[in-house]
């Protein structure tokens, strides 16, 4: 995963001042270079034209579910203690993807968290940029079927959430997709 809990805690303490600054910035903050170059390069970042990095924040904790005022079986009317089946990192990727409809999400990585928010940096590529089109390692992202990657769980965090990093015994109902197996896989 992104980094050990211990390292994460150390980073949070070290970056407390930095996060205080981030909290006052917009939810989607475009930045010039990655905050964690090691993490960025691990998930595919290279400093080239046509590459955009956006830092975003998402609320922490379980699902915020609205109260429904219509009739329900009491057991189905739950609001608290419900965990979303989608990770906060995936939510971050999806929101950034909606914010930049002309770009495509390559990947993302964790950069910090405080009491209320988790901060992620999302790497986006411009599929119409000549440098990306000519790049042998990245030209695949210009193809039509790579549209809406984040929304369809095709990023690294998305694949993890769909269980596709598991294989062998116990993973029989994960492929080709959860939906194909009537969501019995997760």
List the predicted regions and their residue ranges.
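Long, contiguous juxta-domain segments that are non-catalytic but functionally important
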Residues: 17-47
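Compact beta-sheet-dominated globular domain cores
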Residues: 125, 137-140
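Single conserved hydrophobic/aromatic residue that forms the stacking wall/gate
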Residues: 1-9, 13
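Histidine-centered divalent-metal-coordination microenvironment in nucleic-acid enzymes
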Residues: 54, 107-128
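A glycine-rich, hydrophobic loop/mini-helix early in the fold
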Residues: 42-82
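A short, contiguous, amphipathic alpha-helix enriched in charged residues
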Residues: 79-103
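Short, charged, solvent-exposed linker or helix-capping segments at domain edges/interfaces
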Residues: 65-67, 131-138
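Intrinsically disordered, low-complexity terminal/linker regions enriched in Pro/Ser/Gly
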Residues: 139-186
């Amino acid at each position: 995963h992104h980094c050990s809990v211990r390292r994460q805690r150390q980073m949070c303490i070290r970056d407390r001042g930095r996060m205080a600054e981030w909290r006052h910035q917009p939810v989607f903050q475009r930045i010039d270079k990655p905050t964690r170059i090691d993490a960025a390069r691990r998930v595919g970042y290279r400093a080239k034209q046509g590459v955009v990095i956006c830092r975003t924040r998402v609320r922490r904790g379980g699902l915020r579910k609205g109260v429904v005022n219509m009739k329900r079986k009491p057991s189905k009317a739950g609001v608290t203690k419900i965990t979303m089946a989608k990770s906060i990192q995936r939510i971050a990727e999806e929101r950034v993807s909606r914010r930049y409809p002309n770009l495509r999400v390559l990947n993302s990585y964790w950069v910090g968290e405080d009491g209320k928010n988790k901060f992620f940096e999302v790497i986006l590529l411009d599929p119409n940029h000549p440098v990306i089109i000519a790049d042998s390692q990245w030209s695949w992202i210009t193809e039509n079927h790579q549209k809406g990657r984040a929304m369809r769980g095709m990023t690294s965090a998305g694949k993890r959430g769909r269980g596709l990093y598991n294989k062998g015994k116990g993973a029989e109902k994960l492929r080709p997709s959860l939906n194909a197996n009537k969501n019995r896989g997760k």
